[in-house]
Amino acid sequence: MPNNKEDIKGLTPATQEVFEQVSQLECIKDLFLCGGTGQSLQMDHRLSEDLDFELLGLRKTRPKLDFGAILGEIKAKFPEAKEEILGEDHFLVFVNDGRVKLSFYRPENPVKTMKVGWRYNNLRTPTLQELLGMKIYTICLRTVFRDYYDIYCLLDAQCDLDEAISYASYLSRHTIRSKTMYARLLSPQLFCKDEDFQRMSPRIDITAEEIRDYIKKTMEKDNRQ
């Protein structure tokens, strides 16, 4: 775990500028920082800019996101903050002249208690293993190259694919079949690089086809084919 802000890696310059203040917010204590930033803070495999907070594993003590309290505290630190409400349990807040997006989301269904993978001030992330399951679930909903790249980096860090598939199935409430997830993982044509990805300064230069080949070898090694 980092001891000071100089040890924080994996953020774009705009996000780095506000990260210390965001990490000190009281309103994020019950939330988890998920997504690519939750991974980049632990791996520094690329830069990430969005801060995606999720309310996971809580229902009885705090059934909904407290929009008023969250926005009030953020605006106390960032008076220029602008909000965008996407739904009762999902809203965005833009800070640092709109260059940094904070999202706050509560999944419709409760998520079992998460383990803490990384912590700094009031901010915490899931473990890399849990993030892999989340990423596999995500690519069943959208196809963006950075997610494919993130999955490769997590597998290369020895996260378990079987366990991640099981967790992704759990997140989908078992509506997405394991066979569908494996097929998506072996479909590099769905994941095309774009200019935004190159702006994230990936530490590894790899193509979608090379990622597919790596995943295929991982599956073969575990007797999946």
Positions of PLM-derived features:
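Compositionally biased terminal segments of proteins
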Residues: 1-225
